[in-house]
């Protein structure tokens, strides 16, 4: 009898502890192929946070849509809230990027994504108007080493009077990498590049994008929230009457895991 009571008490204690540490989590999206989709990234309207939309393509690869083009996602780091997309390649035997028709990479400024300050942009086939810009278009610019050592950029050796480099991070390039006739016709990008290294030791081309910390999950009623951890209430910062599952007293919102936790 004593043993039975002890086991019952132990089971009850475990249930209470489980209840006390329970968290209210957002619905995570299923993997895209072999790639995990972390919160708040969303591949369908019913998972993640739809404001952070990306796509799982028919070939089971993740894709990031800009205003007028799409780019493959190469890697995701949920802890730093960043992912890396693959820049557009050059048209064969030319010094023109395939996305020049779209004027390069242009993010939607109303969405919670922006270009990080970790990217070095190599601009190719540029006009002399760039000499009036803060870009490094000098003879010492790393773009010359890139052109001379990169087979796919060999057509750039005789194209355009200039090539230039710059590091992202300014307000003018937080949402776009522009490619156009009046500026530069081609580009590449490298994350955390040390330009002093030989080109064969540069990382693979990539452009790092970061997302803003997500707010609490959207709700229509209390049924959409876990009452043990959160309460559906109006978002005072929204002019659209949006409601969210705000964490109950003693719990805080974890924007990386998408949960209310201690």
Predicted regions and their residues:
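Typically disulfide-stabilized, N-glycosylated extracellular/lumenal ectodomains of secreted
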Residues: 2-262
């Amino acid at each position: 009898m004593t043993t039975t009571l002890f086991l019952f008490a132990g089971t009850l204690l475990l249930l209470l502890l489980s209840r006390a540490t329970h968290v209210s989590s957002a619905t995570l999206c299923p993997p895209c192929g072999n790639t995990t989709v972390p919160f708040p990234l969303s591949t369908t309207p019913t998972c993640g946070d739809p404001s952070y939309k990306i796509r799982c393509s028919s070939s089971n690869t993740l894709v990031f849509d800009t205003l007028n083009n799409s780019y493959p996602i190469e890697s995701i780091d949920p802890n730093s809230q960043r992912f890396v997309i693959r820049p557009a390649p050059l048209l064969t035997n030319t010094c023109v990027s395939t996305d020049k028709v779209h004027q390069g990479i242009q993010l939607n400024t109303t969405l919670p994504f922006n270009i990080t300050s970790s990217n070095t942009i190599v601009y190719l086939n540029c006009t002399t108007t760039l000499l009036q810009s803060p870009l490094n278009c000098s003879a010492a610019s790393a773009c010359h080493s890139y052109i001379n050592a990169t087979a796919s950029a060999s057509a750039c050796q005789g194209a355009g009077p200039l090539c230039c480099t710059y590091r992202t991070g300014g307000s003018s390039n937080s949402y776009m990498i522009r490619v156009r006739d009046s500026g530069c016709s081609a580009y590449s990008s490298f994350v955390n590049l040390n330009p002093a290294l030989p080109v064969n030791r540069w990382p693979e081309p990539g452009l790092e994008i970061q997302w803003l910390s997500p707010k609490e999950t959207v709700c229509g009623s209390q049924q959409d929230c876990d009452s043990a951890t959160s309460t559906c209430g109006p978002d005072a910062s929204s002019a659209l009457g949006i409601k969210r599952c705000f964490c109950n007293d003693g719990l805080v919102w974890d924007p990386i895991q998408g949960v209310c936790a201690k």
